[in-house]
Regions:
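Anion-binding alpha/beta catalytic cores of soluble intermediary-metabolism enzymes, centered on
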Residues: 1-158
Length: 158
């Protein structure tokens, strides 16, 4: 089924493909990479979940993208920055709104010390440097990212 769907996209008979619930990630992505290929200049393939929460005041009227929780294992800071930018592009294209990117972590603005936190802080720095027009902040826990003022409560020393 994935091959047929990918051929339809390649031929302009479909705009997208929803897949993966009944197939492994590898079996879902393989046809896409073989038939559709990646966008020119793409160095890293990543995945995201598009979430729509009804009657939600957060996100873009309840719409969020969470990336990359399904493909890249333990990405380095440069890869995290690239994933953030790529996901922002996908959000713009699919939702038609300007993304607000949060680099998620188990720490908010230094509330915890760990190598994983350091990696997200560095990824945030890289993303801000390489994509200066992107509305981006980090490192943030999810509630601090979506609840106005939530980050002030969870930041270092509180």
């Amino acid at each position: 089924m994935q091959y047929y769907g990918c051929l339809m996209i390649k031929n302009g008979d479909a705009d997208g493909l929803v897949s993966g619930a009944c197939h492994s990630t590898a079996n879902t992505l393989r046809p896409c990479l073989q038939i559709i290929k990646t966008k020119p200049g793409t160095k890293l393939v990543s995945a995201f979940f598009l979430m729509e929460v009804p009657n939600c005041e957060f996100g873009e009227n309840g719409t969020f993208i969470f990336a990359d929780s399904g493909l890249n294992q333990n990405p380095n800071p440069e890869e995290l920055a690239a994933i953030a930018a790529s996901s922002a592009d996908s959000f713009r294209m699919l939702v038609g709104a300007e993304p607000k990117v949060a680099m998620l972590s188990h720490s908010t603005k230094g509330s915890a010390k760990h190598d994983d936190v350091t990696k997200v802080v560095e990824a945030t720095r890289i993303a801000k440097e390489e994509y200066p027009d992107l509305a981006l902040d980090g490192e943030l826990q999810l509630d601090a990212a979506i609840v106005p003022g939530g980050g002030r409560v969870q930041s270092a020393g509180q």
